[in-house]
Amino acid sequence: MNIAYKNATEAFEDLYGFIMGQGIYTNVGTKAVYNVGFYILNPEQRIITTEWRKFSEKYAEREFAWYMSGDRSVKNIKKYAPIWDKMHGGDNIVNSNYGWQWTRNHQLAKCIKQLKENKDTRQAWFTIFDGKEKDDYKYDTPCTLSVGFDIKPGIETLDMCVTMRSNDLVYGFCNDQYCWTKLQQLVADELGVPIGTYYHFAHDLHIYKRHFDMQEKYYKQQLKNL
């Protein structure tokens, strides 16, 4: 695998091949690689254009708008992605509305304030995973651990670093990077600096068994349609 990618599509395609070729079969129906870090040089190129992935920008925008609302209820978002209906205990309330997480204790606002007051700060971080709440994670354990910002010295661009405990490449990463880089752009605009590099670290980066032949199935269908 590479470490630096031009855009999200290049990252997705290379990582898909790397996991399928070098990943380890797990006991939970995935192939996984561990402690993977890479970066995307042009995070504003966040739309996955790989034909067989069939990325939905419309859904990604809905998910980001849901995060921005800070509403923990999945009553509406689950209409577009049924997986959300499996992540609550019957009350439609989840922990993985990241906007709810970053507004608690004004975490994101404090990051922006710190960067405005001191562009060299190393403290502009907010956390998503909260160890004090692990007993509440029965149905929905947040995949993202923390998010940090840096204004790169000399270049004066805003970098973002996202750390994740677990990351499904096909759906998780594709939508996650879309939403996180949208937030990166919003923060950069608030600070009056250009968007910089997006850094992504995943402890467990994986592909589910049902997606092992995703690429092959797509091209077989294309041949049938000729």
Briefly describe each language-model feature range.
Residues 1-226:
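Terminal, non-catalytic protein-protein interaction segments that mediate quaternary/complex assembly
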